Amino acid sequence: MLDLSHRRVGVFIDVQNMYYSARNIYGSKVNFGNIVLKTLGDQRLVRAIAYTVSTKTGEELPFFEALHKMGIEVNTKELLEYDSGHKKGDWDVGITVDIIRMLDMLDVVVIVSGDGDYVPLGEYVKNRGRIFHVASFRESTSSKLVECADVYTNFSDDLPSFLINDPKYRPTPNTKSSAVDTFDDVIAEQQQKEHVELPKPAPKSDQPRRRGRKTNL
């Protein structure tokens, strides 16, 4: 059996992409702790980072705290609101920059998203001799992103591991994602789940300085 314990892995989670995929397709919530555990396997965790937005109300803070308790770092950016009423809070550029900066300390990059904007990143990661692992719900994933991946994990093949069912939820396939939503409906479920123990990440001395903002709870 192949020993994978030496492989250094970074898991980068596009929270909103996962949240809306699970809600719109399955009417369910995401088990973020299991996403990290299942994509990591027997490999060595260096960093597990969730990227999301913060709002003026602060209602999402309990959700961030739940992720912290699972051993997942949380990076946030403020929701941008324009005079036109348009709101923007996507993280694709920020995630890409972080991965490029951390690449020297990783053997495997796990991008948890179905967004086709990560295809150029995947090509770069592979050209640098690293493994590009994509994990997502196939129904909401770009075919080009799947083709680009060295390894692809389809959460839809093992829904009990990656979803938290809620009888009050119903699939809403025609609902458009909005950066203003703040995840209050997933907070209680994440907090009530059994504590997920993630492998200890590498010591801070082995890691580059973190860019951007991290939530302080």
Question: What residue ranges belong to the model's regions?
Answer:
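Terminal and domain-boundary accessory regions
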Residues: 1-217
